[in-house]
Amino acid sequence: GAPMSFFCATGADPASQNYAREIERLRQKIAAGAELVMTQPVYDPAVLDRMLDDIAPLGVPVLVGLLPLSSYRNAEFLHNEVPGMQIPEAIRERMRKAGSGPQARKEGVRIAREMLAAVRDRVAGAYIMPPLERYEMALEVVDGFLDPR
């Protein structure tokens, strides 16, 4: 068969508690051959912008990670229990007001779409991590953003 083609990608956390160390490690990974950066889920465009500005001279494309929130409880769990996840208070408050169920999922999609709209001109693309078995949320996030083929 045809030869396979591979490239090396790496992860990065724009909201890292030790941001300087995160950027230094990212530089090392790129120097070692990483050709693409995939971020942890981000909920604040300013947080991503800072990282994009800092690594722009390295010339490596970035895929932003988007994880649509499914409920207030989900937002609080991710923020308080998952290391490295930082969800701004304003986002958690929006999810609190939305509660749970379909209305909360709509708000989670809206938040992810707002993030994508805010950064789409600065990133190579996005990857969507829908909550468990909520694949339709990924489609709702990208609806209207994809170029027609």
Give short role names for the model-derived ranges.
Residues 1, 32, 115-125:
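A structural motif corresponding to the C-terminal end of an alpha-helix
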Residues 1-4, 11-16, 57-115, 132, ...:
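Active-site pocket-lining/capping segments in soluble small-molecule metabolic enzymes
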Residues 17-32:
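Active-site glycine-rich loop that binds ribose-phosphate moieties when present
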Residues 18-21, 41-59, 133-144:
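Active-site-adjacent beta->alpha loops and helix N-cap segments on the catalytic face
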Residues 29, 33, 64, 126:
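Conserved, mostly hydrophobic/aromatic
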Residues 35-44, 127-130:
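Catalytic beta/alpha-barrel core
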Residues 101-102, 106, 121-127:
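Glycine-rich phosphate/diphosphate-binding loops and the adjacent beta-loop-alpha structural elements
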